[in-house]
Amino acid sequence: MSILRINDMAPNFDANTTHGKISFHDWLSESWGILFSHPKDFTPVCTTELGYMAKIEKEFTKRNCKIIGLSVDPLDDHEKWSLDIEETQGSKVNYPMISDEDLSVAKLYNMLPSEEVNDGNRTAMTNATVRSIFLIDPNKKIRMMLTYPMTTGRNFDEILRVLDSIQLTSKNKVATPANWKKNDDVIIAPAVSDEEAKDLFGEFRKIKPYLRYTKIDSND
């Protein structure tokens, strides 16, 4: 099994989803994308996760980012469970969910825990994906990967924050500091000289030669 790393090309695949059959790269088109797996339908933590993602999906849409979920459950379960999510979490799931019953995508993206992935005889009936998230850019490159244990629900506001950071730093010679949020000051890249920094950003605060802050409109 290949090991995926940041800046690798996101593997393409065909899959059955609640929105019909897709080819992943074609579905992404020119958008950013979030591919995230959950262990099992009709489970409590997953219900809260998918409900919250449904609630904030519009924020990803504003940023030209599509969302797609995945588990090894059949499509019928996805569709029935979506009704429970809407009932209990107050948000309708409008993004597609992949039914990966043969584990092909889970294995392609290393979404299975080690005690399960090492047994070639395991099936969807005995496997459950961990809580993995992949952020993919319009060039189909993996820009961020996160994996949580099954017992810990994810912070999807953090995923949105990372998307904001990566979109901003992809267009500007900057990085974002610890706990950065959209429209906070950013750090000028060390490779940028003071002279170039003045040309690019105008005013900036110099704490150390390697630590310089400036402000950039995150909506640019």
Question: Language-model segments: which ranges?
Answer:
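Chalcogenol-based redox active-site neighborhoods
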Residues: 1-220
